[in-house]
Amino acid sequence: FNAIKQITSSGTKAKIYSFARGMHEDIEAAKECGATGVVIEIPTSEVKLKYQFPKWDTDTLIQKSVDSCAYAKKLGLETIYFGFDTCRADMATLDRLYSTLVAEARPDAIGVVDTVGCCLPSAVHMFISRLKKYGVPLQIHTHNDFGMATASSFAAMEAGANVIHTCMNGLGERTGNAATEQIMMGMKLMYGLDNDYHLEKIQAS
């Protein structure tokens, strides 16, 4: 809380998003510390529900997802739905979840989350392609357990993802996330995408 509050009061022009569990208290804290938006973390896979949230079933998952996103939107926060462990979730469950979520709460974006870094780039491409039907901007969040974070991020971009989550030098949880510098240089040199990023600041970062 204090770290995010310090960042939001620093005068930066960047949009600052706070992670939050699917709880009103967390969402209120994000609002209080001045965040532009909130990234709402909710489990989606059967294995996460079984071992981390054993009292939840699919109906509970959907209800909490809709409730938390609707509450964040009510507070005026940009709302990113971050259903973690997306890539190990049952596809029928995801379809039911997303169709209900978009109809009843309509988050500003949906994140596809490869929590344990087990998804091949081709599978990430499939996920993004399939979820485009919901008409909501899509984001990709990868981990590097099998060295696929950057490749999977580019696969998501090719499939139509609007945002790629990255970390400088890939310094994220466990084996890390997609490296900011790899994504930025790949977009410029491999895809020929012009952008206004200050690439000269990569080394200093």
Where are the regions a protein language model picked out?
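Catalytic cores and adjacent flexible loops of soluble metabolic enzymes
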Residues: F1-S205
